[in-house]
Amino acid sequence: EAGEECDCGSPENPCCDAATCKLRPGAQCAEGLCCDQCKFMKEGTVCRARGDDVNDYCNGISAGCPRNPFH
């Protein structure tokens, strides 16, 4: 929703302040295939294995798993 940086779900989420829906200090992300312990995963980390096809990889600058353009 507008103004939210993360999903205000559980107060136990270590990355997101449930009261403000903002990322906690030092957190880059709160969820996503390329988010691990509140940080973006390193560029080149496989986020979606495709078996016989080309895998999808984290880009190091977002929590989402970008689709490989070669699919």
Curated annotation (Swiss-Prot):
The keyword Secreted applies. Disulfide bonds join C6-C21, C8-C16, C15-C38, C29-C35, C34-C58, C47-C65. InterPro entries: Disintegrin_CS, Disintegrin_dom, Disintegrin_dom_sf. It is found in: Secreted. It comes from the Eukaryota. Pfam families: Disintegrin (PF00200). A motif (Cell attachment site) lies at residues 50-52. One of its GO terms (cellular component) is extracellular region. Keywords: Cell adhesion impairing toxin, Disulfide bond, Hemostasis impairing toxin, Platelet aggregation inhibiting toxin, Secreted, Toxin. Its main location: secreted. SMART domains: DISIN. PANTHER family: ADAM A DISINTEGRIN AND METALLOPROTEASE DOMAIN (PTHR11905), ADAM METALLOPROTEASE (PTHR11905:SF159). Belongs to the venom metalloproteinase (M12B) family. P-II subfamily. P-IIa sub-subfamily. The disintegrin belongs to the medium disintegrin subfamily. Monomer (disintegrin). This is Disintegrin applaggin.
